[in-house]
Regions:
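Non-transmembrane amphipathic alpha-helical segments
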Residues: 52-55, 84, 138, 170
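Active-site-proximal alpha-helical scaffolds that flank and shape metal-associated catalytic sites
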Residues: 42, 65-165, 194, 198
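Acidic, carboxylate-rich catalytic segments that either coordinate divalent cations
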Residues: 190-219
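Intrinsically disordered, low-complexity terminal tails and inter-domain linkers enriched
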Residues: 214-253
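Long amphipathic all-alpha helical oligomerization modules
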Residues: 163-194
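Short alpha-helical hairpin
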Residues: 8-32, 51, 169-180
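Alpha-helical bundle segments that constitute or directly flank the non-heme di-iron/ferroxidase center
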Residues: 12-17, 31-61, 125-135, 204
């Protein structure tokens, strides 16, 4: 049994919680409130911005064979920011000005500390688990979302074939790396996999419950402006992951 298959079996209750989360089911069924979805958009926009330095921190540790794929991820994440900006403008949501929630902030710090302080294989495990969780989550939404829903572009981005190809590539690479590690190293990777799934569940919970920071009024919770990784609002017509998928298909690796 592959490393990922073992992890999926071991943590199947967490995968069930992710795929059955009310946020996803309500988005699929068209019953999610505009306010709840706007909360998710603002927080995930901050998360995608933070994912850029996460990937950048992995690059110096990565094997040469992964340089191209990680560079492609950086480009795709920038396009995802455009997607958020385009959708927010379409539905009248202001992305800027919302401080990170407690869960968003904690998840970002988990990403960055893993990338900077842990071996590459552990950071790559977190990358795979997070991307796989998003693919599986939006596949749930894809099963029943109305074609005219304003959230269809998010479904197309994360449930589409290009992103699926990227996630499959990450999975194959992770299984390959795991075969070259010790049992102790694999157990550390498994623990980070578990924590990533827990953070994914917590992120949906945060958005669905409009979570702030525990113990304080929200006007005390933080800054009124986030980082500006991507001020350009232009957006191309294709999936953010199309360029990377083409590189994987044409070269056998990204």
């Amino acid at each position: 049994m592959s490393f990922i298959a073992q992890l999926d079996q071991r943590f199947s209750p967490l995968w069930d919680r992710i795929r059955q989360h009310p946020f996803l089911l309500e988005t699929r069924d068209g019953t999610i409130s505009d306010e709840v979805f706007a909360t998710w958009m603002r927080q995930d926009y901050l998360f995608v911005e933070a994912a850029i330095p996460f990937i950048a921190a992995l690059l110096p540790k990565a094997p040469r064979a992964h340089w191209g794929s990680l560079a492609g991820v950086l480009q795709a994440l920038e396009k995802e920011l455009h997607l958020f900006e385009e959708r927010a403008a379409e539905v009248g949501v202001e992305l800027r000005g919302a401080p990170p929630s407690f869960t968003c902030h904690a998840y970002v710090q988990f990403l960055l500390s893993t990338a900077y302080a842990r071996p590459y294989g552990e950071g790559f495990t977190v990358l795979y688990a997070a991307e796989r969780a998003y693919h599986d989550s939006w596949k749930v939404v894809q099963e029943g979302i109305a074609p005219d829903s304003p959230w269809v572009p998010f479904v197309e981005n994360w449930a589409g074939p290009e992103f699926a190809q990227y996630v499959a590539y990450l999975g194959g690479e992770l299984d390959g790396m795991a075969r070259e590690t010790t049992p102790t190293e694999r157990e550390r990777m498994a623990e980070l996999y578990r924590l990533t799934l827990l953070y994914e569940i917590a992120f949906w919970e945060m958005a669905h419950g409009a979570e702030g920071w525990p113990g304080v009024d929200q006007d005390m919770a933080g800054s009124t402006s986030g980082p500006a990784w991507n001020p350009d609002r232009a957006r191309g017509p294709e999936s953010a992951w199309a360029d990377l998928a083409r590189r994987i298909e044409e070269g056998g690796e990204a």
